[in-house]
């Protein structure tokens, strides 16, 4: 079974306090669901080909099903409720190569 990854790029953070509160709830919820943070970068080391200088987070899961379950878990949904509209971001779940 191929691993899966959350790839999250933050276009803007409008409310740093809400973002910090989200992080305090999201990290344990993600880890409880089996997520392993691989990248938590405030900015890329270098961008190419029109790349944007955006905060990026990559989290590994054992499968797509587990990645989706983590997103849909009660703990992560509570973190999203706290986050509200304080950020503009793109979160996608991608399957790794098997």
Model-derived features: positions:
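C-terminal structural segments of small proteins and small subunits
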Residues: 67-92
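Short S/T/G/P-rich N-terminal loop/turn motif that feeds into the first structured element of a domain
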Residues: 1-56, 61-72, 95-98
